C-alpha cells in the first residue's frame, strides 16, 4: 500500500509549547500534503486523495544532539511516559482525519522495511514556520 512513513518525535516540553490547534494543523498537513503523483506524474495527490495509509513510528532519536560530542544526547526527547501519550494522541488525531494508520510498538526495537519512492523527505515542525 502506498502512503507516508511518518516519524513523529516527542519533545519533553511539547505540551507546554504546542497547542492542540498546532498539532491538528500539522496532522492535517500530513493527511493533505500533495506529494503523490497524479496521472501526469506531478506531485498533486494526498493521502486522502489516494486512500493511502501512514506508518507512524515513534522516533525519539530525532532529538539526538551530537554537536561537539561523539555520543548523542537525548535530553530534549520526552521521557517515555509523556512520549507514549504524545505518540498515541498523534495516531488518534491522524486517524480522526480519516487516514489509516499502522503503528510500531512504542519503545521497542523494531526492524522496519519500506520502499521509498523518491528521494522525498519533508520536514513538518511545530517549532518552525516554513
Model-derived regions: residue spans:
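Compact, glycine-rich, soluble single-domain proteins
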Residues: 9-51, 61-92, 96-97, 102
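Short, low-complexity, polybasic intrinsically disordered segments
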Residues: 74-77, 117-130
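Residue-level signal for inorganic ion chemistry
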Residues: 26, 57, 120
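Flexible glycine-/small-residue-rich
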Residues: 14, 58-59, 114-116, 124-126
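Beta-rich nucleic-acid/ligand-interaction surfaces
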Residues: 108-113
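A short, glycine/Asx- and small/polar-enriched loop/turn
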Residues: 52, 114-119
Amino acid at each position: 500500500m502506498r502512503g507516508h512513513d511518518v516519524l513523529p518525535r516527542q519533545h519533553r516540553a511539547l505540551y507546554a509549547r504546542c497547542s492542540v490547534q498546532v498539532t491538528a494543523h500539522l496532522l492535517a498537513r500530513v493527511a493533505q500534503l500533495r506529494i503523490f503523483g497524479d496521472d501526469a506524474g506531478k506531485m498533486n495527490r494526498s493521502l486522502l486523495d489516494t486512500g493511502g495509509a501512514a506508518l507512524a513510528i515513534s522516533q525519539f532519536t530525532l532529538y539526538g544532539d551530537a554537536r561537539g560530542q561523539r555520543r548523542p544526547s537525548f535530553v530534549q526527547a520526552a521521557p517515555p511516559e509523556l512520549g507514549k501519550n504524545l505518540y498515541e494522541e498523534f495516531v488518534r488525531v491522524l486517524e480522526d482525519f480519516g487516514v489509516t494508520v499502522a503503528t510500531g510498538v512504542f519503545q521497542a526495537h523494531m526492524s522496519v522495511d519500506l520502499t521509498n519512492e523518491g528521494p522525498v523527505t519533508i520536514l513538518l515542525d511545530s517549532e518552525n514556520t516554513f
